[in-house]
């Protein structure tokens, strides 16, 4: 029996979600390029499921882009490129002439936002990236976390991880941050809340294990997870 797609899963659970009185719990993790956002998400998933006897927590990262790729018959690379792209009259005109089935950036971002909101409302979700904080800014019973670090620290980490020199690592950071600039502006407009995140950590000072411990304490104090058993 084929495993249901994320879209099918969400559709199948819409009735259950509509009956749910309270959203969450959920956690969103935003990160600067070069920080341990993905690794932190994996570690948090492990720690959260240690607190949950039913091990209901799941992590969502590239799964959303993968699902949209499967739904549209496109590659994840095309979906990601369009998600980051700015509106273009010429591109939209050509898209209309070709009757292109490729969704534009606006459609892709809206679909991802809907997925994120649905997942967060259903609860027991660790959402890494994908504009999670902006998409869930008005949904209760969640915590939004941001991981940052000085540029030099991120350059050193990328240099080691990718086995490249620091100049190349710096160029990678510039390229990624330039691509994300437009997306970040849209997220700021979508979520004008100040501060934008519940917690912000300096990854150069706190390791992922230390950050996770602080997040667990915060989630416990907010009633999102049960106290640790003694």
What would you call each of these model-derived segments?
Residues 125-129:
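Structural recognition of the conserved hydrophobic beta-strand(s) that form the central parallel beta-sheet
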Residues 60, 146, 203-204:
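Small/polar loops that bind or transfer phosphate-bearing groups
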Residues 65, 132-134, 148-154, 206-207:
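Conserved nucleotide-binding/hydrolysis micro-motifs of P-loop NTPases
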Residues 102-106, 179:
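Short, flexible loop segments at the rims of nucleotide/cofactor-binding pockets, characterized by
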């Amino acid at each position: 029996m084929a495993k249901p797609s994320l879209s099918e899963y969400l559709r199948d659970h819409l009735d259950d979600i509509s009956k749910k009185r309270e959203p969450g719990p959920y956690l969103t993790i935003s990160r600067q390029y070069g920080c341990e956002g993905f690794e932190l998400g994996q570690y948090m998933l492990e720690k959260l499921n240690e607190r949950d006897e039913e091990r209901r927590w799941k992590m969502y990262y590239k799964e959303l882009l993968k699902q949209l790729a499967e739904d549209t018959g496109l590659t994840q690379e095309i979906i990601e490129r369009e998600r980051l792209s700015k509106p273009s009259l010429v591109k939209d005109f050509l898209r209309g002439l070709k009757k292109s089935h490729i969704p534009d950036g606006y459609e892709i971002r809206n679909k991802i936002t809907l997925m994120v909101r649905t997942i967060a409302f259903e609860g027991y979700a660790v959402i890494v990236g994908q504009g999670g904080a902006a998409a869930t800014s008005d949904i209760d019973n969640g915590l939004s976390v941001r991981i940052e670090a000085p540029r030099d620290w991120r350059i050193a980490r990328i240099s080691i991880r990718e086995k490249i020199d620091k100049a190349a690592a710096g160029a990678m950071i510039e390229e990624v941050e330039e691509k994300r600039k437009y997306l970040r502006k849209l997220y700021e407009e979508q979520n004008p809340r100040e501060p934008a995140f519940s917690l912000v950590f300096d990854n150069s000072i706190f390791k992922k294990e230390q950050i996770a411990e602080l997040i667990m304490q915060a989630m416990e104090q907010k009633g999102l997870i049960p106290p640790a058993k003694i």
